[in-house]
């Protein structure tokens, strides 16, 4: 007697999207003499991000500059190494491209990224306070698509927040800042990192977490886009942790019912039952009423009209990024690292 074969569930386009994007083929070693620093736009834990111009091509880029001596002293080389290894091996329409590095300079380690001219979601939220439902849905779907691609490579992002979501000239988003991203070698990891208001309960409790913490952060982001603040905000970090552990979410009366539902599903305190973490994975997200009739295919191929188009005047426009005030930093001393002691030299 023939055994009845199980019916295989057809994969959604979102699940198949990882097959159309592969490794970053634009990555190369760079000559620092080809670039002119325009101005500083951002400080990270380990370095600064600048807008710079390729003098030969007359083209803008982001450049992240780390002092090697500071990296070695901080014993935090892992985050920089992770960013290099991950971004040099991924390529996706919603993830910023690492275009090259210079690792042979004895003083600095330099990462060169594509320039994303439209500013950040954080800036847009400061202007608009809260976003229309369709705008929030568009951006959330884009991030879900990027997360699905990363998760299929066993990479977790761990740093979702409006500041790290940038707009290209057409209003589509790019995830940036991969210093906290990690490729999971084991099933779980335990490090507390990211923005406290976006911490998942399992991260705070140090129970071990995986992609579950990324799905939690999607619920926090959607709430912030629609309401104008995060659901567990408090000026005291310890109270933020307490609120997250309690898991009580307060919603305004006028919030869309399907938005409220998907936020609750993402902010499920049980990480094994959380939306995106169950057996059906990403398919459960696609089938949420919040995404009913949403065109995932045309989103992926940039065929949808973005809800917000940033104002950009030419290829050299930097007006969407505020110039960071130059201050004397503790690590401004130019300490050279010998090749023999330089862990970055042979990358």
Regions found by a protein language model. Give the residues of each.
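Conserved short submotifs of the Hanks-type protein kinase catalytic core
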Residues: 107-120
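Activation segment signature within eukaryotic-like protein kinase domains
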Residues: 139-140
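Protein kinase glycine-rich loop
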Residues: 38-49
């Amino acid at each position: 007697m023939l055994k009845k074969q199980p019916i295989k569930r057809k994969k959604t386009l979102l699940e198949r999207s990882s097959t159309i994007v592969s490794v970053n083929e634009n990555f190369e070693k760079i000559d620092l003499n080809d670039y002119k620093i325009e101005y500083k736009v951002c400080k990270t834990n380990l370095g600064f991000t600048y807008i710079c111009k390729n003098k030969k091509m007359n083209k803008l880029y982001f450049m992240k500059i780390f002092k090697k001596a500071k990296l070695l002293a901080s014993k935090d080389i892992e985050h920089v190494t992770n960013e290099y290894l991950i971004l040099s091996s991924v390529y996706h329409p919603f993830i910023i491209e690492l275009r090259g590095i210079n690792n042979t300079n004895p003083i600095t380690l330099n990462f060169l990224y594509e320039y994303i001219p439209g500013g950040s979601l954080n800036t847009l939220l400061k202007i608009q306070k809260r976003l229309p439902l369709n705008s929030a849905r568009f951006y959330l779907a884009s991030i879900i698509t990027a997360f699905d691609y990363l998760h299929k490579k066993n990479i977790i992002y761990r740093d979702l927040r409006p500041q790290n979501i940038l707009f290209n000239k057409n209003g589509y988003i790019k995830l940036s800042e991969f210093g906290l991203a990690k490729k999971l070698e084991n099933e779980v990891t335990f490090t507390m990192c990211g923005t406290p208001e976006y911490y998942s309960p399992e991260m705070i409790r140090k129970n071990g977490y995986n992609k579950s913490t990324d799905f939690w952060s999607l619920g926090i982001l959607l709430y912030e886009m629609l309401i104008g603040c995060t659901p567990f905000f408090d000026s005291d970090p310890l109270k933020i942790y307490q609120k997250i552990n309690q898991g009580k979410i307060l919603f305004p009366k006028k919030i869309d019912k399907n938005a409220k539902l998907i936020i609750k599903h993402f902010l499920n305190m049980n990480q094994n039952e959380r939306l995106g973490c169950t057996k059906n994975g990403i398919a459960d997200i696609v089938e949420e009423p919040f995404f009913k009739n949403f065109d995932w295919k045309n989103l992926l191929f940039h065929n949808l009209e973005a809800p917000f188009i940033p104002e950009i005047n030419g290829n050299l426009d930097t007006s969407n990024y505020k110039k960071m005030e130059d201050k004397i930093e503790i690590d401004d001393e130019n300490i050279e690292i010998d090749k023999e002691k330089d862990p970055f030299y042979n990358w």
